[in-house]
């Protein structure tokens, strides 16, 4: 995966998180209360301002929404 692919994947992932939150009619403030993450952390995760959110933050975010995050470590065989 090159840098462009990584940037696109990162943006899509963040957009999907925000879309799921919005589809559940949940505000960032409500998600903050449930997840224990600050509102600014949630905003930064969704907007990309936090360049590398911790796995712990992503798990807390997803758990609060009742969704699972699957991570495939490795690449395609070439």
Predicted regions and their residues:
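N-terminal flexible/basic segments that precede or flank functional cores
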Residues: 1-15, 68, 78
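Short basic helix-loop element that most often maps to the first helix and adjoining turn
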Residues: 15-34, 60
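Residue-level recognition of specific faces of alpha-helices
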Residues: 16, 41-44, 57
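Recognition helix of helix-turn-helix/homeodomain-like DNA-binding domains
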Residues: 36-52
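DNA major-groove recognition helix of helix-turn-helix/homeodomain DNA-binding modules
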Residues: 56-71
